[in-house]
Amino acid sequence: MRSRWQTLRKWIVKAVLLFFVSSLGFVLLYRFVPVPLTPLMVIRSVSSVWGEEFVGIHKDWVPLEEIAPSVQKAVLKAEDYRFFEHNGFDFDAIEKAMKYNKTHKRKKGASTITQQTAKNVFLWPQRDWVRKGLEAYFTILIESTWPKERIMEVYLNVIELGPGVYGVEAASQKYFKRSAKNLNPYQASLIAAVLPNPRRFRIDRPSNYVVGRQRRILNRVAPAIPKAADASLLDFLDLKFDSEEDESAN
């Protein structure tokens, strides 16, 4: 019995060491090379086989300097305005979210951009305690080995922005027919507006909630830009989608 326990303990130690070495290796690798594929991309694509429509993987990696500064500003304002101040965990935001969630049915999150990057690059989408623990682990590794600019670059290249669409460049080409470096503040704010839940909120079919959120983000990113008085900002500055083009052709 004792020998079995010793053997099991050795295997556990080996498994833990293997996980630590391999995870650290991938984190260090992605510090320098583009992320080719993520678990989320695979899970979404495979699960769509049994759905109404197959969803492929559309992505196009670009360096941070080829993404419009307005996109970076919009994402920071919408998701993590203290990104350059914290070390991966925003404890003030966590405390505020806990207080808010005690009195509201709609729960509020406090994940930082680094935490979202850790989840998007290395983990699965379903929420559970194991994933949250691993998310914290990868967040610490990322913050310890990547500069903030690299974290932002990876984040903007792997985030889900519609069915089968990953990264700002792929979203820019699909929805706006332009590269990410040519996005204007309106488009950048619309992209940031769907980030809380890109499966529920759509860039090509924005709800009133998304449009309202877009306005608030835009006010923070570019307060000097004139705002629309009526329902939507989508008529401004070439905000024309495939769906609108299809309707006009019919």
Curated annotation (Swiss-Prot):
Membrane-spanning residues: 15-35
InterPro entries (UniProt xref): Glyco_trans_51, Lysozyme-like_dom_sf, PBP_transglycosylase, Pep_trsgly
Keywords: Cell inner membrane, Cell membrane, Cell shape, Cell wall biogenesis/degradation, Glycosyltransferase, Membrane, Peptidoglycan synthesis, Transferase, Transmembrane, Transmembrane helix
Primary residence: membrane
GO molecular function, one term: pentosyltransferase activity
Any Pfam family matching the protein: Transgly
Catalyzed reactions: [GlcNAc-(1->4)-Mur2Ac(oyl-L-Ala-gamma-D-Glu-L-Lys-D-Ala-D-Ala)](n)-di-trans,octa-cis-undecaprenyl diphosphate + beta-D-GlcNAc-(1->4)-Mur2Ac(oyl-L-Ala-gamma-D-Glu-L-Lys-D-Ala-D-Ala)-di-trans,octa-cis-undecaprenyl diphosphate = [GlcNAc-(1->4)-Mur2Ac(oyl-L-Ala-gamma-D-Glu-L-Lys-D-Ala-D-Ala)](n+1)-di-trans,octa-cis-undecaprenyl diphosphate + di-trans,octa-cis-undecaprenyl diphosphate + H(+)
EC number(s) given by UniProt: 2.4.99.28
Membrane topology: Single-pass membrane protein
GO cellular component assignments: peptidoglycan-based cell wall; plasma membrane
The organism's place on the tree of life at top rank: Bacteria
Role description: Peptidoglycan polymerase that catalyzes glycan chain elongation from lipid-linked precursors.
Name under which the protein is recorded: Biosynthetic peptidoglycan transglycosylase
Organism this protein belongs to: Bdellovibrio bacteriovorus (strain ATCC 15356 / DSM 50701 / NCIMB 9529 / HD100)
